[in-house]
């Protein structure tokens, strides 16, 4: 081989290194999660080469074995106290959930995520004293296992751990009440080769602030730019990312690698959570990072994981109904919209293969029942409390349903989640089973997939606050 060919190959290799592949968050807070082997095949067929997990479920990690997919395995916040207080517990966790899967199953575990957004202000400091000790003990356990060159620790943090005293990125620093702790953690990560992992959500800014400029959430350059001393920011992502970069620089860690642990846009549950906006945001983000341009303060490739891969119908809706609709795929692995991930697909996501469904039948309201029947309201409240009614209401995919259709949707959600048990469609004299699909327009009345019993398929109980049930019940009528 001539020198010209060698140089060409080196150039191609360097180019590939600069164009970081996109990853995806794979959450499993679902009443009926897809079998892990089906999800892994879907990941591979869509060219998704990195996956971020929120736990270390055995079957999930086994399915990822020999796939070549890079894995970030997660430790839930609820485990931090135990791992912080016991090095032995940390060693057992690493042995069971990291070492074994690497040596026996050939899983490409590259990171351990210790906790998930543990310093959110809404947690009221619950994990302030346990996060760093847990992080330290897991790192010690990784070193004892001889995996420190392959597996790095990190701690996914919400973007609220830093802010700006000037409202501009250049004023970025860590939040005053946790600044010392953040510097301790960042220093520890830096010493051990771990990245700073941050979750950035322009959608949340739009959801929580009615005055937030919509165009600034996207990447098409239509927003009024933010002028930070001659550096112009045309979208919120760049401004937020560079606020973190300035915070790191200000505290002596300007070269620390950054991973975007979560970024995405939901498709339902709110007027701004829809297919058009989700496609616009996610495709815009992919185009924004595809050339390795980076941000004004930190040029270069951006390492990121889309949030999320699949919808999760058992997630808490405390933040909002949209929480169950972040997936680029539906709960059963159907693509929601065209999306070019810059991998092996050309804009058409490939659906999950081998998905097995329950029988094609639905639970609906009997046509002769009146809306003011005294049995209706309590039945709907019950169905929504144990089902998923987050697609009902103003601005949602099922917003155009009439009263009876809304009630039918609630009944069917409960019926499907209960695996179509006969008793799950026995609302007193007001419900019946039909084999005629009641779906209409943008509103899909789902048929549930067969339950998966290989792992902790039903360990996540539904959390649907009564106030939210009441709010949906009001919107139905």
Swiss-Prot record:
It comes from Arabidopsis thaliana. GO terms for cellular component: plasma membrane; plasmodesma; plastid; side of membrane. GO terms for biological process: carbohydrate metabolic process; defense response. The keyword Zinc-finger does not apply. Glycans are attached at residues 97, 124, 406, 429. The lineage of its organism: Eukaryota, Viridiplantae, Streptophyta, Embryophyta, Tracheophyta. It catalyses: Hydrolysis of (1->3)-beta-D-glucosidic linkages in (1->3)-beta-D-glucans. This is Glucan endo-1,3-beta-glucosidase 6. The active site is at residues 117, 262. GO terms for molecular function: glucan endo-1,3-beta-D-glucosidase activity. A lipid is attached at residue 455 (GPI-anchor amidated glycine). It comes from the Eukaryota. Residues 1-21 form the signal peptide. It holds the Pfam family Glyco_hydro_17. It is a lipid-anchor; GPI-anchor. Its EC number is 3.2.1.39.
